[in-house]
Structure formats: C-alpha cells, structure tokens
C-alpha cells in the first residue's frame, strides 16, 4: 500500500529534477518551459496526494485550475518562442538581449 510519504517523495523528486533541469540548461527556452511544467506536475501530485489522504476534494479541484493555467502558460510561451525564432533564428536565452523595445 502506498502511503502519503511515497507520493510526497515522488513530488519532491519531480520538483528536484525540474530545478536541476533549469539550472543545468539555461540556454534553451524549450527545456526551461518543460522544466517549469514538470514543477507544476510535481505540485499537482502533492495536491492530489494530500487531497486523497485528507478526504477532501478541494485539492483535486485546485489541480484543474493549475492545469488550466499551465496550459495557458505553455501556449503563450510557445507563441513567444515561435515569434523569437522568426525574429532571431535562434531560441537561446542569451540572445534575448538583441531584441529592441
């Protein structure tokens, strides 16, 4: 039987992998966005685990709101990424200082 601690450890591992992904690769915007999405997934895992073990559905309902915000964030981030690639022909974070405005 899986306990609450197992799910919390899983969430912590996912969150740590996302943090490592951001710190090890600061150049590629796509990988940074994927790491942020992995962080949100880890938080959602913890919400569902706490919600299940406390017998309350508020955590599970909140997960739907977080997923909605994550989907909007991914769509806006990818739209900015496509515009950046069309403008600069690169997706490196270091080249963002070439933009004017």
Swiss-Prot record:
It comes from the Bacteria. It is found in: Cell inner membrane. The keyword Cell inner membrane applies. It catalyses: a quinone + NADH + 5 H(+)(in) = a quinol + NAD(+) + 4 H(+)(out). Disulfide bonds: none annotated. One of its GO terms (biological process) is ATP synthesis coupled electron transport. Belongs to the complex I subunit 4L family. NDH-1 shuttles electrons from NADH, via FMN and iron-sulfur (Fe-S) centers, to quinones in the respiratory chain. The immediate electron acceptor for the enzyme in this species is believed to be ubiquinone. Couples the redox reaction to proton translocation (for every two electrons transferred, four hydrogen ions are translocated across the cytoplasmic membrane), and thus conserves the redox energy in a proton gradient. NDH-1 is composed of 14 different subunits. Subunits NuoA, H, J, K, L, M, N constitute the membrane sector of the complex. This is NADH-quinone oxidoreductase subunit K. The lineage of its organism: Bacteria, Pseudomonadati, Pseudomonadota, Betaproteobacteria, Burkholderiales. The gene is nuoK.
């Amino acid at each position: 039987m899986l306990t609450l601690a197992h799910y919390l450890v899983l969430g912590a591992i996912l969150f740590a992998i996302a943090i490592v992904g951001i710190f090890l690769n600061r150049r590629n915007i796509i990988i940074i966005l994927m790491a942020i999405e992995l962080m949100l997934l880890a938080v959602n895992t913890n919400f569902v685990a706490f919600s299940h073990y406390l017998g309350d559905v508020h955590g599970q309902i909140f997960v739907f709101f977080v997923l909605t915000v994550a989907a909007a964030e991914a769509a806006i981030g990818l739209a900015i990424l496509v515009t950046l690639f069309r403008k600069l022909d690169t997706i490196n974070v270091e080249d963002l200082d070439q933009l004017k405005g």
